[in-house]
Amino acid sequence: MKTQLNILLGGLGLFALQGCKAPQAEQSVQPNVIYVFPDQYRNQAMEFWGQEGFREKVNFRNDPVHTPRLNDFARESVVLTSAMSNCPLSSPHRGSLLTGMYPNKSGIPLNCNSSRPISSLREDAVCVSDVFCNAGYDCAYFGKLHADFPTPNDPERPGQYVEDRVPAWDAYTPKERRHGFNYWYSYGTFDEHKNPHYWDTEGRRHDPREWSPLHESGKVVSYLKNEGNVRDPKKPFFIMVGMNPPHSPYRSLDDCMEEDFNLYKNQPLDSLLVRPNADSKMLKAESARYYFASVTGVDRAFGQILDALKELGLDKNTIVAVSYTHLTLPTNS
């Protein structure tokens, strides 16, 4: 019997773990590992918290969102309700996630932003990806990194920034700063969700004009299928997927998929904003529809990765984790 282990780290307070443990003698095959972590995803925005077996375990009311794939994932898991981020801020959290260090040690005490003091992942730090690489894994990173300070190192325009002006957030990560990730499809930070861009392993830029979580899940599926011989099929793999949504903005259909927005567009705001201190009359209250639509879209993108694992027969020997950098308050952002 092979071991299957699923992990779900939700917001600042959920840790789910599933698997039937095989006898030690049967665990000779190294498991694959996939770690998916959307940005700015609130703990309450998971539908299963309102379902039997879960709602009794928490002291909050869940948001009225549709997350069918996370619901199923949680049902197959042991859910812990008190996991938390030591630093629920984008870049510092990522530094701690990668290195296991507190932000004052990882090199990233602040969000990586060119208008602030330099904050950037230490090149000499041993990251989790370095450990996997040294253990014989093929390592791949997809999506938002936000762990490097913007510098003039555009691979296609040496000596220039990745934008025509000094970017506030976005940055290119060269090979020597990738910490064991031998497959790369990533960017620093860029918040146009339907107009994303990525740099690949060789530093080529791609502008796919596709909602970023669905594009990234498609690239992960391609990697799993080993299209283009991008990984060694004899090696186990370690994958990290840094989805940007449901990070702001959440103002219009430029920020989410219309099919997901349609699930919420006709619902009264009073029924969407269920926290007792929420003010549905605020101008920004309308953002809840777009935020929840992004949550549902991220759920769908995550489901595509799970479907590919099952289709390829990789699901029984793959550890899957879902985590979030930090929560958000849609009407306050």
Across the structure, where does each feature detected by a protein language model lie?
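Formylglycine-dependent sulfatase
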Residues: 4-13, 20-327, 333
